[in-house]
């Protein structure tokens, strides 16, 4: 039976604290990777964003129209952010980044490299639960693994106090490491749906705020099933 939680946020917090404690920017969780951005690459990215916004107004308009068709999913996505304006800007920045880089496959390859005979199946905008709150980004689903990367560098807590360092939050799991993927719903707010992943060594991850929840959940389960079938052959 899939879990149904009266207060999913309590469950998210307890799970995150149990398995993703930070120690000065380093994480006990072997699937979490922290990548510090370089000022040069950030400047190039900003320059490219401005260039695309200036040259590709039509593409941005087309993308906006498509987004409006998913208004329900977008509302569910944006409400997980403490700032709707920040979430909207993150989505615009991510969409522009995809145009600049030539699509999600190239972004995936640049951020995570490529494994042998790996093929990207799909990617979805979502949030991941962390001890610091929901982090917006994109989850990439390939035939070999799932990978998440935050849209922008976030401030990570420091054991010495202070503001900590700004870094990209990434999660990478190969399919053979994943034990289960399930769906859960906040019974007090049925529109809030979550994807719960558990690894074979007991680590848990919660993803939420999908613009296309059903498509994402089905894609994840199909990829997990195909991976198990391939390993059984």
Swiss-Prot record:
Pfam families to which the protein is assigned, alphabetical: GRAM
Annotated region (Disordered), positions in chain: 1-45
Bias (Basic and acidic residues): 1-16
Gene3D superfamilies named among the record's database cross-references: Pleckstrin-homology domain (PH domain)/Phosphotyrosine-binding domain (PTB)
Every GRAM domain range: 106-185
Family assignment from sequence similarity: Belongs to the GEM family.
Protein name in UniProt: GEM-like protein 2
Origin species: Arabidopsis thaliana
């Amino acid at each position: 039976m899939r879990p149904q939680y009266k207060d999913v946020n309590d469950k998210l917090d307890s799970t995150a604290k149990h398995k993703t404690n930070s120690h000065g920017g380093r994480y006990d969780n072997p699937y979490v990777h922290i990548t510090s951005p370089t000022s040069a690459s950030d400047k190039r990215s900003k320059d490219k964003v401005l260039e695309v916004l200036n040259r590709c107004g039509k593409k941005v308009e087309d993308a906006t129209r498509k987004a409006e068709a998913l208004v329900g999913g977008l509302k569910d996505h944006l409400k997980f952010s403490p700032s709707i304006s920040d979430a909207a800007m993150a989505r615009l920045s991510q969409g522009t980044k995809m145009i600049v880089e030539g699509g999600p496959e190239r972004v995936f390859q640049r951020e995570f490299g490529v494994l042998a005979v790996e093929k990207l199946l799909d990617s979805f905008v979502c949030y991941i639960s962390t001890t610091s709150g929901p982090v917006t980004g994109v989850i990439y689903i390939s035939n070999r693994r799932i990978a998440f990367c935050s849209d922008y560098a976030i401030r990570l807590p420091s054991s010495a106090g202070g503001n900590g360092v700004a870094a990209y939050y990434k999660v990478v799991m190969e399919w053979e490491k994943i034990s289960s993927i399930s769906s859960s719903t906040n019974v007090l707010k049925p529109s809030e749906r979550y994807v719960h992943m558990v690894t074979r060594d007991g680590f848990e991850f919660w993803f939420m705020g999908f613009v296309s929840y059903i498509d994402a959940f089905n894609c994840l389960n199909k990829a997990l099933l195909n991976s198990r079938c391939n390993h059984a052959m």
